[in-house]
UniProtKB/Swiss-Prot annotation:
Disruption phenotype: Increases readthrough at premature stop codons and leads to an increased rate of translation. It comes from the Eukaryota. It comes from Saccharomyces cerevisiae (strain ATCC 204508 / S288c). Appears to play a role in translation fidelity, and may act when translation is compromised. May be a component of the ubiquitination pathway. InterPro entries: Bul1-like, Bul1_N. The gene is BSC5. The keyword Lyase does not apply. Residues 18-30 have a biased composition (Low complexity). This is Bypass of stop codon protein 5. Pfam families: Bul1_N. GO terms for cellular component: ubiquitin ligase complex. The modification Phosphoserine is found at residues 111, 350. The lineage of its organism: Eukaryota, Fungi, Dikarya, Ascomycota, Saccharomycotina. GO terms for biological process: protein monoubiquitination; protein polyubiquitination; regulation of translation. Residues 1-42 are annotated as: Disordered.
Length: 489
């Protein structure tokens, strides 16, 4: 990765002080802007002009994008995203995360069992009198009120995040937009938006970014921002009470780097871009740690999702493998009856589809869905407190529908039949190679010249066709999908 020596934006009198510590995503940082005289260094990646925002030198990305395969810990997900506390979020997530600092001792010689330097966890510049220290293996860790603020809130009765759609919705001047791009978006560069007709398949990577803007003249406090890739199935049944619609959520993937967290790194480059201003779309990177959107403040963050090959094993309680495969998109996710464009929505015979003009709307295809629906979408949701009632509610939400056709023409579904065939083909290939080697050695021992035809003849798989059918599937009683492969004797 190379770094450009010319800043794309120049700014006046702005300087950033940051402190970061390594995390699962590469770094967690909090920062404090300071305006004053610039003490320029060539490596600072900051410059100044008449603007009021900060900018960084944009790193040049490699053309080949590699999605990190590092998964966050279950503990991190449980503490940050699995529950929605009904009390104040500030109790559990202070504005600045704790950071580690090496504290020196006054003693010149450390005592036995103690190290010369202590690692101390701090949440501010001063360790108050209420804080105390715990020594573990010669290392001291400061704890106190600040540590209790980031404790697990298992004892707090929270709302499971799966019930987020059941929360009451209120109208706020927060505008949320979602954009899907052809490649990984880059800071300071104009993105190339993906076509609405794009179909994704298993293993494909979805790139994009979102923007959140406060369009009012007053600061707005929010509690949490979630960015997910979700899949739902819906069906309609006739009952004595009318038509009932049943919806089940079959897939839920959370981008923890794009959702609100203390992390402000671009996952594509590993750069800490917190607070940097992008003149391309007039946005600042990252969501503020204070969770307060100032008037006119427009924020953005990048997201990345990888389409899975199958759902979780617990999707089918009977353990049928075929039931855990990712179903394809089916049907039309019709908007609510209050949508202004619903009355003018028409199916185009020439194009073969119909859709609303809104970005991210579902495609209406002639797929004979008969009221059934399988829909995949990227969802952005902002949760906060209603000022009037004090209850947790949805302050803003946005959905971007995507089409998924798993196991495209170049990818075959994983099945037991394919496993059997792969093993048999592998046996044939090994036998072919061994036969070729034996024939070559035999001719060498008899001093017979080796010709190209000898190798080609040994490579013919039809000579070894009796090898097929050497494996059989031992299915579990009552379940043909689960079992083991057994080699025939």
């Amino acid at each position: 990765m190379q770094e450009s020596k010319e800043p794309q934006n120049k700014f006046e009198g702005c300087q950033r002080i940051s402190s970061s510590s390594s995390t699962l995503f590469g770094g967690t940082s909090f920062e404090e802007p300071r305006c004053g005289t610039s003490q320029g260094k060539e490596e600072d990646a900051f410059a100044c002009n008449n603007g009021d925002h900060c900018s960084s030198i944009t790193n040049v990305q490699e053309d080949d994008f590699v999605l990190p395969e590092l998964l966050p810990s279950f503990e991190m997900y449980e503490n940050l995203l699995s529950n929605i506390p009904q009390s104040s979020f500030d109790t559990y997530f202070p504005e600045n995360p704790p950071f580690y600092e090496v504290a020196s001792r006054n003693q010149s010689i450390p005592s036995e069992g103690e190290s010369g330097n202590d690692m101390r966890i701090l949440t501010g510049d001063i360790v108050g009198p209420d804080n105390h220290e715990v020594t573990v293996d010669g290392r001291r860790f400061a704890s106190g009120p600040a540590e209790s603020q980031i404790r697990n809130y298992d004892d707090t009765k929270g709302i499971p995040v799966e019930n987020i759609y059941a929360l009451p919705r209120i109208k706020t001047p927060i505008a949320t937009e979602l954009y899907v791009t052809k490649t990984a978006p880059k800071f300071g560069q104009l993105p190339k938006h993906e076509s609405m007709l794009r179909e994704y398949t298993s293993g494909d990577i979805i790139h994009g970014y979102f923007t959140v803007e406060n369009k009012s003249t007053k600061p707005i406090k929010f509690d949490m921002f979630y960015l997910t890739l979700e899949g739902t199935t819906s069906s309609k049944t006739q009952s004595p009470f009318g038509i009932q619609k049943t919806t089940e959520r079959i897939l839920r993937m959370v981008d923890m780097a794009a959702s609100w967290s203390y992390n402000h790194e671009d996952v594509n480059t590993g750069e800490d871009l917190c607070g940097f201003f992008d003149s391309i779309d007039k946005t600042s990177f990252g969501l503020p740690n204070s969770r307060i959107l100032n008037p006119g403040d427009k924020r953005k963050k990048f997201f990345t999702f990888k389409i899975p090959n199958q759902l979780l094993d617990v999707t089918c309680k009977h353990g049928h493998f075929s039931h855990s495969l990712l179903p394809p998109t089916l049907g039309f996710d019709r908007p609510s009856s209050s949508h202004p464009e619903l009355s003018t929505l028409k199916f185009s015979e020439s194009l073969g589809y119909g859709r609303l003009s809104e970005r991210g709307s579902s495609l209406w295809l002639n797929d004979s869905s008969s009221g059934s629906l399988i829909n995949y979408s990227i969802n952005a949701m902002i949760v906060g407190k209603d000022v009037a009632s004090g209850r947790v509610c949805l302050m803003s939400e946005k959905k971007y529908s995507i089409r998924i056709v798993p196991f495209g023409f170049q990818n075959n579904p994983i099945s037991r039949e394919k496993c059997l065939k792969d093993l048999e083909d592998f046996d044939i290939e090994i036998a072919n190679r061994l036969g070729m080697i034996e024939k070559v050695f035999s001719k060498i021992e008899r001093a017979i010249p080796i010709h190209k035809e000898d190798i080609q003849e040994a490579n013919r798989s039809d000579q070894l066709s009796p090898l097929r059918g050497k494996y059989e599937w031992n299915a579990v009683a009552g379940n043909t999908e689960n079992g083991t492969l057994k080699k025939k004797h």
